[in-house]
């Protein structure tokens, strides 16, 4: 996959003045998508705190009036951008977890999807795991909900339904996120896919210790 191709696909083509036969709701959706992509690009390059509405307008190719028709402020735009980043990452993870295969193979596929997507989409990765912490309470609450969903999916794949088992799933996902975040902050995106194998080895070892019969 081309580096950054999923984000580019979200941006779509540049809209021009006039109707051109495009339904109004499609124009609205396209404008919102372009501004969300513009925010992801700006926040990844400059850091959320330094981003201005003008930065988003320049990248999205829309007017200031259009921006405020969609978003009350910069934080609201970042929230939409974060949701787009979540969709890009979690869609591939969800597909892996939904596969018709044994639990550990699904977990392996989900980790591969997670790390490879972050490596291929560096701007998305920065917004998803780094700049989210600078964007205010509403975005942080959304981030917590996203991670809780990831924990639920992981626990469900392993059949971990008891409270103690969920805590273990939460610890595993916390470690995955921390490892990825450290590499992203360091700018070492190439190291991300290599995290999957040692994590899977550790997980398998833990499961074998819990179930010596390997059932």
Predicted region positions:
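N-terminal intrinsically disordered/low-complexity leader segments
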Residues: 1-30, 158, 211-215
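Helix-turn-helix
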Residues: 42-76
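Short, hydrophobic secondary-structure boundary micro-motifs
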Residues: 52, 126-129, 192, 215
């Amino acid at each position: 996959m081309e580096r950054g191709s999923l984000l580019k696909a979200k941006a779509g083509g540049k809209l021009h003045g006039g109707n051109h036969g495009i339904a109004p709701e499609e124009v609205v959706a396209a404008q919102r998508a372009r501004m969300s992509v513009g925010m992801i690009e700006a926040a990844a390059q400059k850091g959320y705190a330094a981003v201005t509405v003008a930065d988003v307008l320049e990248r999205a190719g829309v007017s200031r009036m259009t921006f405020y028709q969609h978003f009350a402020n910069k934080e609201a735009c970042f929230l939409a951008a974060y949701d787009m980043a979540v969709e890009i990452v979690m869609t591939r993870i969800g597909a892996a977890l939904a596969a018709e295969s044994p639990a550990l193979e699904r977990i392996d596929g989900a980790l591969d999807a997670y790390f490879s997507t972050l490596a291929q989409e560096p701007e998305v990765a920065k917004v998803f795991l780094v700049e989210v912490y600078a964007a205010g309470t509403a975005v942080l609450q959304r981030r917590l909900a996203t991670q809780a969903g990831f924990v639920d999916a992981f626990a469900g794949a392993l059949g971990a339904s008891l409270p103690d088992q969920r805590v273990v799933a939460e610890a595993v996902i916390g470690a995955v996120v921390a490892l990825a975040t450290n590499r992203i902050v360091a700018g070492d995106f190439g190291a991300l896919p290599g995290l999957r194998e040692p994590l899977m080895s550790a997980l398998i070892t833990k499961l074998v210790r819990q179930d010596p019969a390997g059932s």
